[in-house]
From Swiss-Prot:
Protein's name according to its UniProt entry: Methylosome protein WDR77
GO BP, one annotated term: positive regulation of mRNA splicing, via spliceosome
GO terms for cellular component: Cul4B-RING E3 ubiquitin ligase complex; cytoplasm; cytosol; Golgi apparatus; methylosome; nucleoplasm; nucleus
Pfam families reported in the protein's UniProt record: WD40
InterPro entries xrefs: Methylosome_Comp_WDR77 (IPR052139), WD40/YVTN_repeat-like_dom_sf (IPR015943), WD40_repeat_CS (IPR019775), WD40_repeat_dom_sf (IPR036322), WD40_rpt (IPR001680)
Length: 342
């Protein structure tokens, strides 16, 4: 098992400092979120969690190796509060969960040199902790510390439904990549709910959390439509089949709580698990560890797999580092006598 991490990629020496219009002069300390776009561009969500003003910002890098150097970004914008979570909406839209209680939609404009606001809706009563876009791309889900979950119509810029199915703060929502009306949520009430917005009573409780520890992170399996994973406050990761939720595969991965779970784009996906123990682990389909890194010196907050190089995993953290890890992949099997190579 490999545990070493290569040094971050170094921006080319010939690159010139060129801060785009409307971008903040300085990036805040805490890197909260990172998402690759399909073309390999990198989006960062950043917060300032110290000082008199808790502000945040969004940064778009066409060259991910330049992040987090603000002078080499392609576009950037200040937000009025910290960024708790974000996700792409297509190739131009950016959906943001704000510490202010707002759900925000931003969009790249002017040849991707500006990030402009499309809407900002204050309909939650506390920090919006998590957002996800349903597979249709036209609707989104937000979860908040006000214990509420909201469904959004992105084109109409309105919330369609508001649900108080949880009795505790909502920590994660995760849209199914297979069905455009299905998503998961978990909360500090210890419950994981499976949602189908087509149903009169859309939420059903999953009986998969026998440990009693609070679930803290969720992710759908990208290829198996009935399978998801969740992490808990004790550092364990569990694999669940929604058709037989009482039978789960679990592994003690971290010494502290799991904060994020991200699947890779491989045909047999790897799973990245992030934790409050400041480490990241990459797990195979049996939840066995294939890679671990402790390169971050503070909480590691998000991870995103490169769509162009499937062995490249990028993480960000409160130590203001963007680290590009090369994850060892299993070697391809030798071609058999019946194999044909074109």
């Amino acid at each position: 098992m490999r545990k070493d991490t290569p040094p971050p990629l170094v921006p080319p020496a010939a690159r010139e400092w060129n801060l785009p219009p409307n971008a903040p002069a300085c990036m805040e300390r805490q890197l909260e979120a990172a998402r690759y776009r399909s073309d390999g561009s990198l989006l960062l969500g950043v917060s300032s969690l110290s000082g008199r003003c808790w502000v945040g910002s969004l940064w778009f890098f066409k060259d991910p190796s330049a992040a987090p150097n603000e002078g080499f970004c392609s576009a950037g914008v200040q937000t009025e509060a910290g960024v708790a979570d974000l996700t792409w909406v297509g190739d131009k839209g950016i959906l943001v969960a704000s510490d202010s209680g707002a759900v925000e939609l931003w969009e790249l404009d002017e040849n991707e040199t500006l990030i402009v606001s499309k809407f900002c809706k204050y309909e939650h009563d506390d920090i919006v902790s998590t957002v996800t876009v349903l597979s249709s791309g036209t609707q989104a889900v937000s979860g908040s510390k006000d214990c509420c979950i909201k469904i959004w119509d992105l084109a109409q810029q309105v919330s369609l439904n508001s649900y108080r199915a949880h009795a505790g703060q909502v920590t994660c929502v995760a849209a199914s990549p297979h069905k455009d009306s299905v998503f998961l949520s978990c909360s500090e009430d210890s419950r994981i709910l499976l949602w189908d917005t087509r149903c009169p009573k859309p939420a059903s409780q999953m009986a998969c959390n026998a440990s009693g520890y609070l679930p803290t992170a969720l992710a759908w399996h990208p290829q198996q439509s009935e399978v998801f994973v969740f992490g808990d406050e004790n550092g364990s990761v569990s694999l669940v089949d929604t058709k037989n939720a009482s039978c789960t595969l679990s592994s003690a991965v971290h010494s502290q709580g799991v904060t994020r779970l991200v699947f890779s784009p491989h045909s047999v996906p790897l799973l990245t698990s992030l934790s409050e123990d400041c480490s990241l682990a990459v797990l195979d389909s049996s939840l066995s560890e294939v890679f671990r890194s402790r390169a971050h010196r503070d909480f590691v907050r998000d991870a995103t797999w490169s769509p162009l190089n499937h062995s490249l995993l990028t993480t960000v953290g409160w130590d203001h580092q963007v680290i590009h890890h090369v994850v060892p992949l299993e070697p391809l099997p030798n071609p058999g006598p019946d194999s044909v190579v074109e």
